[in-house]
Amino acid sequence: MAKEDYYETLGVPRNASDSDIKKAFRRLAMKYHPDRNKDNPEAEERFKSVKEAYDVLSDPKKRSAYDQFGHAGIDPSMGGGGGFGFTGDSFSDIFGDVFGDIFGGGGRRRGRGQRGSDLRYNLELTLEEAVAGTEAKIKVPTWVTCTECGGSGAKKGSAPVTCPTCHGQGAVRMQQGFFSVQQTCPTCRGTGQHISDPCRVCYGQGRVQETKTLSVKIPPGVDTGDRIRLSGEGEAGEGGGPPGDLYVHIGVKQHPIFTRDGADLYCEVPIGFPTACLGGELEVPTLDGKVVLKIPAETQTGRLFRVRGKGVKPVRGGVAGDLLCRVRVETPVHLNKEQIDLIRQLDESLRGGGSHHSPQAHGWLDGVKQFFDRLGL
C-alpha cells in the first residue's frame, strides 16, 4: 500500500501543534497495536505507518525537512521515512516501558527488506502544456539501491548473519525491578540480522542518496490537483527491499489571458464603445489559434459569448469544453475637444429618448427613487 502523507496518517492538519500530534499518535497506537490485533496483519502495517509518521512529525528538525521536501527530506538512518518500521523509542516516551511488557510488543522484529518510502514531486506546468500534454524532465533527490553491495548492506563476498544478541528476534528482554521489559535489540536495531562486515559505500544501509533525472509523460487535459504515479521510482528499500513509488502532483500556472474551470476556458474581451452600440466583428485568441467573434449591436458589458469546442478535452476522456468570452465595454479616454462635443451631442440626443435608450440605467434610477420615497427622503 502506498505510503500516505504523514499528516494524513495521523489525521492532523499541517499546522497541528506538538500536543495534537502526540494525542493523535497515542490514540492510533492504542487502536492498531499488533498485540491488540493478532489476526490482522493490516493493523500491524498501519501501526508501523503511524509510528513512522510520529517519529518524523514529533522531531522539529525532521518535521521542517519533511514540510519542505516531503519524504525525500528525511534521512531514513535517523529514524524517519524509508520504511524502517519502528524502533520503540518514542513509544516508550509516550506510554512508558511498562506498556511494552503489557502488550509484549515493545521491540517487535522489523526484519530486513523494508519497502522504500513513496516520494512526492510538485510539477508546475503552463496552461498550454497542461491542455496539450508534454514530457517533463524532473530531478528527484532520493535513495537508490547501492550498486556495490546490491542492496544487502554487506561487503562484497559476505552476507548478513543472524544477530548473535537477539538470535534473530529483533528484540531483547530486560529486567527492571518487578517488570520484564522487551526492547529493540541494540545490536541489529530490530532487524534480527547483523552485518559484521558492512559495505564500504552504503555503510550497511543497502542504499545511497542520489539525484535521479526522470522523464515524465504528462497526458493532455491535466489540471491542478491531478496526480501521476510512477511505480518503483520512489526511495529504494532498505536491505534490498522493494522501492516505493513517486507521485507527481500537477500545478498549473496562472495564464495572462485564460482562466480554466473544468473543461471550459474563460477570457475577458474589451470592446470599444462604437462596437458595443453598432455591432461588429472581433478576433479573439484560443489555445490553438484565433476565431472571429460576431458582436451584435447593443451589446452590454458582461455579456457572455460561447465558442464551442475551444476549451479543454478532459484527461479522463469526453468532448472538449468551450471558450466563454465575457465582453467589457471600454470607456473612451484622452478625448480631444471635438470628441467631447460629439459625446455631449450624443448624450443630449439620447436623453431625449428617455428610458428607451438606457432601460437598465432608468430602471435602476426608478428603483432608487422608490427606495428613497419609502424612507421619506
From Swiss-Prot:
Positions that bind Zn(2+) 1: 146, 149, 199, 202
Oligomeric form and interacting partners: Homodimer.
Superkingdom: Bacteria
Gene that encodes it: dnaJ
PROSITE patterns given in the database record: DNAJ_1 (PS00636), DNAJ_2 (PS50076), ZF_CR (PS51188)
Family: Belongs to the DnaJ family.
Cofactor: Zn(2+)
Gene Ontology biological process terms, A to Z: chaperone cofactor-dependent protein refolding; DNA replication; protein refolding; response to heat
Role noted for this protein: Participates actively in the response to hyperosmotic and heat shock by preventing the aggregation of stress-denatured proteins and by disaggregating proteins, also in an autonomous, DnaK-independent fashion. Unfolded proteins bind initially to DnaJ; upon interaction with the DnaJ-bound protein, DnaK hydrolyzes its bound ATP, resulting in the formation of a stable complex. GrpE releases ADP from DnaK; ATP binding to DnaK triggers the release of the substrate protein, thus completing the reaction cycle.
Gene3D superfamilies for this protein: DnaJ domain, Heat shock protein DnaJ, cysteine-rich domain, Urease metallochaperone UreE, N-terminal domain
Zinc finger (CR-type): 133-211
UniProt KW Transmembrane helix keyword: no
Annotated Gene Ontology cellular component terms: cytoplasm
Record key words, sorted: Chaperone, Cytoplasm, DNA replication, Metal-binding, Repeat, Stress response, Zinc, Zinc-finger
J domain boundaries: 5-70
Pfam short name (any one): DnaJ_CXXCXGXG
The name this protein goes by in its record: Chaperone protein DnaJ
Domain comment quoted from the record: The J domain is necessary and sufficient to stimulate DnaK ATPase activity. Zinc center 1 plays an important role in the autonomous, DnaK-independent chaperone activity of DnaJ. Zinc center 2 is essential for interaction with DnaK and for DnaJ activity.
Mapped CXXCXGXG motif repeat ranges: 146-153, 163-170, 185-192, 199-206
Keyword Cell inner membrane in annotation: no
Residue ranges of the region described as Disordered: 219-242
Annotated TM spans: none
Localization annotation: Cytoplasm
Free-text remark on how the cofactor is bound: Binds 2 Zn(2+) ions per monomer.
